[in-house]
Amino acid sequence: MKKRALSFMLAFTMVAAGLAGCSSSSGSSDTTAADTTAAGSEAADTTAAEESTGEKTTLKWSVWDISATPYYQLLVDAFEEKHPDVTVEMVDLGSTDYQTVLATELTGSGSDFDVVSIKDVPGYTTLVNKGVLEPLDSYIESSGVDLTQYKGIADQVRVDGQLYELPYINSFWVLFYNKDIFDAAGVEYPTNDMTFEEYDALARSLTVTTPGQEVYGAHYHTWRSAVQLFGVLDGEHTILDGNYDFLKPYYEMVINEQNDGVCQDYATLKTSGLHYSGAFAQGNVAMMNQGTWFFSTLIEKIKTGEYTECTNWGIVKYPHAEGVEPGSTLSQITSLAIPTSSDNKDLAWEFIQFLSGEEGAEIVASTGAIPAIMSDSVVDLISSTEGFPQDENSIEALNTSNLYLEMPVHAKSSEIETALNEAHDSIMTGSCTIDEGIAQMNEQVSAILAE
């Protein structure tokens, strides 16, 4: 039964996450298939020459949060073992401003990245618009890669008919919880079918505001998605609507929790730069909405003994509004691309093909993370990962129903993202009221959409 649930979950997740593409852009690369083939042949000749002289080729890969992502080094080690003439150099650009830093690197002079990680849709849109990513279609065709294994993801990230990235990680949001806090309070664990009202009441029942003994019933990271995207789970609204009145009840819930000490103060979190993993690791957070990308970090840090206050954890499905199907949640993919400036495009493609394929998927799954493709072996690896919670609710939480993108495809997604982030920050810090912040979103995003 567990295996069937996981299989269904992964298949559905990857279909929905496939929507995480990018819209058309007049600024896309003018590189033709012929140019790409010629460049690939030249790169292949260079690689062959290096092999004959015994020299190693270095592939430079941009990533973020190396220390918190255990599958990075495992992927690199496996690829280097299959390619002893290659060294993969990871460059950590940090998670906070990753896409901004990457765009600066790729549009500046002297960038020597061969493979770049794509973190989100707005960042992808920006890079495609700037013409700094290589079209992958000729590589895919010549390699015989079956794009159907991505369950529609590849088709959804095409720009003007061309594909500039290939996904290798697929993530969705769940509710993490610390069982020890519930046990100490004598409160039953959260379930896979909670309305927001039930969730809010549960968080309040676990909260302790005594100075020095604080227990937070809930925790929200400083990303706008941790609050705003509660409002899109009904399938009727998107974050591109241009009118955001539907967000008011969710902001009211979180602001009231913040005022009552149910969750930590946003401004304090922002100033201190406390990472969500650090907050949960302290052992005084009962529930935290976060993505499945946290699985691998949590499992690894507990295994190494770095996390000692949150070892008894579980997950359940996202809370939902009345009338919304349980298991409705948010989805996001992480992809790989080749910069047009790379001198090793053919080898970079081999690396991408490895990470995005079956072998890479099994390595990712072995750490508890969810890859972009699913097979029986991948499902077995996820379900049997040491440290992954084995209670029925945690397994069932992986069986999602409806998935919605954090940021849907749009040519101006980056501008919209900026406007929404600014308004979110103003609301959460108290710089403006909820009504004023929503009015700001309505005005600014509507103007962007009308351009």
Protein language model annotation of sequence segments:
Residues 81, 87, 185, 260-262, ...:
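Extracytoplasmic/periplasmic substrate-recognition and gating elements
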Residues 19-32, 41:
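Bacterial lipoprotein signal-peptidase II cleavage site
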Residues 203-204, 239-270, 318:
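Glycine-centered hinge/linker elements that transmit conformational signals in sensory
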Residues 50-51, 119-172, 310-317, 386, ...:
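Hinge/lid segment of periplasmic solute-binding proteins
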Residues 54-66, 86-91, 114-115, 164, ...:
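Short, well-ordered beta-strand elements
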Residues 113-114, 119, 143-181, 214-217, ...:
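A structural signal for short loop-to-beta-strand junctions that line the ligand-binding cleft
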Residues 316, 366-422, 426:
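Long, aromatic- and glycine/proline-rich binding clefts that accommodate carbohydrate-like moieties
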Residues 78-149, 184-186, 279, 284-287, ...:
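Extracytoplasmic "Venus flytrap"/periplasmic binding protein-like
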